């Protein structure tokens, strides 16, 4: 609807979902694909999006935040997506822009295409926003699911543990590398 743009009501719904995740201390997973804010909603849309961003920032570092960039994401939605701890972009359709690529001088002049300015390759190699690049939406969802498997169900639980039984996986010398005293120096190259 309206190119996946976010209105006041939609930002408020997402904010309430984030509040529930914060109360239950469970990860937040945002699947982003849309054209930014709804112009016809005016400033009210931006105000509620500001509340949404504030909630995401408050959760950052306290509960895991995942962003899956599955299509073009523009404007304030791109800022929200960038707050995540883990960002996975689909190389098939994922694009991230702060403003519409159609008003970017390099694109207007024909020097670059929207793909060259904001696709998964750019954000994984140059901007650093994308942690992982997926082939398509299904691959991005699979990657997020795999990452979630390394985390506990909520932030107060212990992470999952799977003993492999392979002695080669054990490195007792790791216990000696970093001293117990945080003021004591150690060799970072080891």
How would you name each of these model-derived features?
Residues 1-8:
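STAS-typified acidic loop motif
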Residues 21-23, 45-46, 88-90, 175-183:
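Short low-complexity stretches enriched in small and charged residues
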Residues 132-189:
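Terminal amphipathic helices with adjacent charged low-complexity linkers/tails
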Residues 1, 13-39:
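A structural preference for short, pocket-lining loop segments at secondary-structure junctions
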Residues 32-156:
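Conserved catalytic cores of soluble enzyme domains
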């Amino acid at each position: 609807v309206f190119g996946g743009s976010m209105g006041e009501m939609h930002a408020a719904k997402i904010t309430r979902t984030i509040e529930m995740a914060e109360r239950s201390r469970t990860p937040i997973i945002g699947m982003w694909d849309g054209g930014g804010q709804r112009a016809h909603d005016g400033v009210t849309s931006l105000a509620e999006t500001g509340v949404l961003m504030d909630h995401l920032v408050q959760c950052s570092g306290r509960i895991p935040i995942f962003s899956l960039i599955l299509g073009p994401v523009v404007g304030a939605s791109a800022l929200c997506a960038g707050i995540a701890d883990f960002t996975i972009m689909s190389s098939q359709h994922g694009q991230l822009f702060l403003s519409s690529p159609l008003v970017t001088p390099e694109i207007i002049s024909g020097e670059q295409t929207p793909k060259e300015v904001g696709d998964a390759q750019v954000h994984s190699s140059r901007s650093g926003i994308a942690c992982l690049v997926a082939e398509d939406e299904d691959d991005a969802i699979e990657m997020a699911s795999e990452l979630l498997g390394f985390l506990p169900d909520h932030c107060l639980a212990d992470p999952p543990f799977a003993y492999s039984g392979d002695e080669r996986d054990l490195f007792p010398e790791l216990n000696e590398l970093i001293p117990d005293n945080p003021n004591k120096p150690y060799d970072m190259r080891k």
